[in-house]
UniProtKB/Swiss-Prot annotation:
Keywords: ATP-binding, Cytoplasm, Ligase, Magnesium, Metal-binding, Nucleotide-binding, Purine biosynthesis. Its EC number is 6.3.5.3. GO terms for biological process: 'de novo' IMP biosynthetic process. Pathway: Purine metabolism; IMP biosynthesis via de novo pathway; 5-amino-1-(5-phospho-D-ribosyl)imidazole from N(2)-formyl-N(1)-(5-phospho-D-ribosyl)glycinamide: step 1/2. Substrate binds at S89, H90, N91, H92, R111, Q235, E307, S308, Q309, S529. Mg(2+) 2 binds at D112, D263. Part of the phosphoribosylformylglycinamidine synthase complex involved in the purines biosynthetic pathway. Catalyzes the ATP-dependent conversion of formylglycinamide ribonucleotide (FGAR) and glutamine to yield formylglycinamidine ribonucleotide (FGAM) and glutamate. The FGAM synthase complex is composed of three subunits. PurQ produces an ammonia molecule by converting glutamine to glutamate. PurL transfers the ammonia molecule to FGAR to form FGAM in an ATP-dependent manner. This is Phosphoribosylformylglycinamidine synthase subunit PurL.
Length: 730
């Protein structure tokens, strides 16, 4: 095949990028080399439009063992224990083929974690779909949920938390972000940096097929009218093989034979071999004729770019090949010595005794493009002027019913009941709470994790939205009694070639960085997914934040369910009734303008740290952060979980009742405290200058909002739980 500029463009490269390749090589690349460059230089693998801005994120902290740059981030949780975690996107494949796209997204992120020596202990996900009225939404949701459950359940890893949202901006591009946590001892962490010369390079796992070729390139482009033609680029997963691969790798890792290990994810054998060589500042020579293939007559181009799943690349110590082979034979997995490390600092590929590629590693990595793209700064929208006369026509009970049954608020039990959330026996807080919690096996420690995003806030003002979503993650961890330690992010945006989209990305990252730095909540891993658009219609900016925190004694964990009648309910944080960009404004007033609520980072940190003090003194019986839908929505969920009611104090309505109940001011929590502990608890709040108000009392009767408004617990449950089940089953 003749390689020329047009063929390079067909591979997703720009004209100037193709010229740069020819200049670096001092010749025209052959077809295999062109394929390798197209994979390594695409947006998905090279981060060419985002690296310039991501370098400013805070990535260090006293608990950080490994930050961005490896397969996953690693944090120290004490006693020689570490948690490995990361979130990644599988958006484009999941829109084309929802079951396999979601399944292989889960499989890929689990491999990232166990590649580093950690046994996966928990999965989470953040999934976003178009309008419920859109013709594709229901089938896409069903396929994605089945794919996530099908893979995670077969692997025997619990899915402990997640987020699901609906918005018309996802009609043409759904988002599927998968997150995994793993546990490892600090002295058994493995890395992908190759070292030593003449070391054997080993291929293990499944055979290589033609599935997923150009998967990474497809994830670096917008959709058009030919979406169906892209189905062959979607990988096909086999969780049972991955389970075997997990156990085989962990068995091999128990010894001292592994120098470096890398899973074959995006761009397959291409990215895994090049990343190992680049980090080790050496070369790798591979004989592609030795790669186990499941299809006949595969070319070097196909072998290098295949994204067949459940495969690993390992650099071993010399003389350990037979021992390693016995392990993988025992687990019925392919094992092949396909090459060796060299001093050439090149990727050299052979096929049928012919050299088919010869590329200096630095041309693929250090010399890959990096763009400081043009971007537009977003203006902070003006506050909306609400005509409060229209409130007179509204009834609180009717509004609450509508808010609780909103697709973005309602119970997602239909989804998470399809996931095994108790397998492994260490889940101590299941989905549906502020965060999922798993015990660190054999210890009193527990790890809490949540995943959050707020596309509406980020769309209204990206800088504020970026801050808010980090703070939301922080509050969710605080609410279960966990000290927040670190985050991973999945940054989902439209085309970076559009100045407005790029501006959304830049300012969201700035906001994210500011909040992370202030809260001492560093970013240890992540992923960028651009080109989430069909033709020129892009998604709302959707950064998803996966937060991880530590509970030193799992018996101090807190849940959101109300516990006992006559206990006191306090609102922590000041309530000013911010309705702009609230669910009330959008759903009830049909008002979509205005700025998101203001973020006060001092209050966020101070409020959260003070609540942890109260939790550690066992003053707090239940807690829940206040977010979408405001105070009354948060309180309703606490009532539903505990099957208890609450009576609100009438004196709260110093501002308009609807502003008080449904405003989305940030930095707030509802906490339940016994009357006996109230004096001591409020003393701590006052000593730490934390604003609080008495919200009311827990009761057994229902939610009593005022003299005219009482909602039974059964009605709350019905409003909150029925929508999704009815939508999916009718």
């Amino acid at each position: 095949m003749i390689v020329n500029e047009q063929l390079a463009i067909d591979h997703g490269l720009k004209k100037d990028e193709y010229k740069k390749i020819c200049d670096l090589l001092k010749r025209v690349p052959n077809i295999t080399e062109l394929g390798i460059f197209s994979a390594m230089w695409n947006e998905h693998c090279s981060y060419k439009s985002s690296r310039f801005h991501l370098k400013n994120l805070p990535t260090k902290g006293k608990n950080v063992i490994q930050g961005p740059g490896e397969n996953a981030g690693v944090i120290d949780i004490g006693d020689d224990d570490a948690i490995v975690f990361k979130i990644e996107s599988h958006n484009h494949p999941s829109f084309i083929e929802p079951y396999q796209g979601a399944a292989t997204g889960v499989g890929g992120i689990m491999r990232d974690v166990f590649t580093m020596g950690a046994r996966p202990i928990a999965n989470l996900n953040s999934i976003h779909f178009g309008s419920p009225q859109h013709k594709k939404t229901k089938n896409l949701l069903r396929g994605v949920v089945h794919g996530i459950g099908g893979y995670g359940n077969c692997m025997g890893v619990p899915t402990i938390a997640g987020q699901t949202s609906f918005d018309e901006s996802y009609n043409g591009n759904i988002l599927v972000n998968a997150m995994t946590l793993g546990h490892v001892k600090k002295d058994k962490i493995f890395y992908s940096k190759a070292a030593g010369l003449g070391k054997p390079v080993i291929y293990v796992g499944s055979k290589t097929g033609r599935d997923g070729i150009h998967g990474a390139s497809m994830a670096s482009a917008s959709f058009d009218d030919k979406i169906e033609e892209k189905k062959p680029t979607v990988q096909v997963g086999d969780p049972f093989t991955e389970k075997l691969l997990l156990e085989a790798c962990l068995e091999l890792m128990a010894g001292d034979s592994i120098i470096a290990i890398q899973d074959m994810g995006a761009a397959g054998l291409t990215s895994s071999s090049i990343e190992m060589a680049s980090k080790g500042n050496l070369g790798i020579e591979i004989n592609l004729s030795k790669v186990p293939c499941r299809e006949a007559n595969m070319s070097p181009y196909e072998i290098m770019l295949s994204e067949s799943q459940e495969r690993m690349l390992i650099v071993l110590e010399n003389g350990k090949e037979e021992m390693a082979k016995k392990i993988f034979d025992k687990w019925n997995l392919d094992f092949a010595v396909i090459g060796q490390t060299t001093k050439s600092k090149k990727i050299e590929l052979y096929f049928n005794e012919e050299k088919v590629a010869d590329i200096p590693v630095n041309t693929l990595v250090e010399n890959s493009p990096m763009y400081d793209r043009k971007w537009k700064k977003a203006k902070l929208p003006k506050r909306i002027k609400v005509d409060k006369e229209q409130f007179k026509t509204l009834k609180v009970k009717n509004v609450l019913n509508k808010i609780l049954s909103n697709p973005n608020v309602c119970s997602k039990e239909w989804i998470w009941q399809q996931y095994d959330h108790t397998v492994m026996g260490d889940t101590i807080q299941k989905p549906g709470g502020d965060a999922g919690v798993v015990r660190v096996h054999g210890t009193n420690k527990a790890v809490a994790a949540s995943v959050d995003s707020s596309a509406v806030y980020c769309w209204a003002h990206p800088l504020s939205g970026g801050k808010q979503i980090v703070c939301e993650s922080w509050r969710n961890l605080i609410s279960v009694g966990a000290k927040p330690i670190a985050i991973t992010n999945c940054l989902n945006f439209g085309s970076p070639e559009n100045e407005e989209n790029m501006g959304e990305f830049v300012e969201c990252v700035q906001g994210l960085g500011e909040a992370s730095a202030y809260l001492e909540f560093p970013v240890v891993s992540g992923n960028v997914s651009f080109y989430n658009q069909t033709k020129d219609i892009g998604i709302k900016p959707t950064p998803a934040i996966g937060g991880v925190g530590l509970i030193k004694d799992y018996q101090n964990m807190v849940t959101m369910d109300l516990k006992e009648a006559d206990n006191i309910l306090l609102v922590i944080g000041k309530t000013e009734g911010h309705l702009d960009q609230s669910l009330f404004a959008r759903d009830i007033l049909n008002e979509k303008n205005g700025p998101p609520p203001e973020i006060n980072l001092f209050n966020e940190k101070n409020n959260g740290e003070t609540i942890l003090k109260l939790i550690n003194k066992k003053f707090i019986k239940s807690a829940h952060d206040v977010s979408l839908g405001g105070i009354i929505t948060a309180l309703s969920k606490m009532c539903i979980k505990g099957k208890k009611g609450a009576t609100l104090k009438k004196s709260n309505y110093l501002i308009n009742q609807f502003e008080y109940l449904f405003g989305e001011d940030q930095g707030r929590y509802i906490i339940e405290i016994s009357k006996d502990d109230l004096e001591n608890a409020t003393k701590i709040l006052q000593e730490n200058s934390v604003h609080f108000d008495e919200l009311g009392l827990v009761n057994e009767d229902g939610l009593i909002i005022d003299d005219k408004t009482k909602v039974s617990i059964d009605d709350l449950i019905k409003s909150h739980t029925n929508w999704l089940t009815n939508y999916m089953e009718n």
